[in-house]
Amino acid sequence: MKTINFLKHKNIILAISIVVVLAGIIYGIATDYVFDIDFKGGTRIKVDLNEEYVESDIKDIVSGITSKVPEIQTSSSGNNTITITTQTLSEDESSALIAALEAKYTNIGDPTIRNVQASYGKELFNTAIIAGIVSIVLLLVYVAVRFRTLGYAAAFSAVLGLIFDVCFLFAIYGIFKFPINSTFVAVLLTIVGYSINDTIIVYDRIRENRKLVTKSSDPKEVINQSITQTMKRTIITSITTLVAIGVVLIFALVKDQETLKQFSIPLSIGIAEGTFSSIFVATSIWYTLDRLIHKNKSAK
């Protein structure tokens, strides 16, 4: 198999990747990230009105019950189901709102009401951040121990690749305005696990190939050869995973399952990006750091 020079344009690829991710995050901050009630607290009422409605009428009904500004979300499947999200309502306010909807729309379905206190939402958000940090630290230790023969630059590069994955996911959520909630945490941890698995496969092949060459051999050739050898497996695994996620997405679109859509869409994008980062980002960073370390040692 002909060896592909994946590192030929590493600086350009890294620069473009960083610019795209930073642009997405800046856009998300400038236009406000959408935090779901899981993390900010609030009340969510989902109900099928079973007849045509005007969104402004729904807002008028809510404003007649409470001064809290609502967010009205319509169903993407074309039916008359609406989701009303506000700051936390009391039980009396929720009951009054349902009664007002029943008065205007006489054939509504059974409503689903969910309340999350703001303090609990903040606690959950902080816990999610801590869990993410702990996961990355443990992965750093694992990669450092397993690939210690490659040097600690390998472990550091793998973690930088994971940080890139996390930042990319934040960029996606900022651009497409997916709500940041408990599903976001599940997507994040899944992508991180998938990406580090791809990276470990490449690193493992690099370690094996380095045993077959002399110390004076160009590490760039070893890296390119290792990525080329693992490329087929990586692509097949990614495609298989994306097909499975695609089935989930189709089901979510047909059945109008909002949670599954919030999970499958960013996950499919993240899986593709995780494959990209394990091939181009982590290995490019590792090669650059490894050359800098050897250059400094030679200078001494």
Regions found by a protein language model. Name each.
Residues 1-300:
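A structural signal for conserved, well-ordered secondary-structure elements
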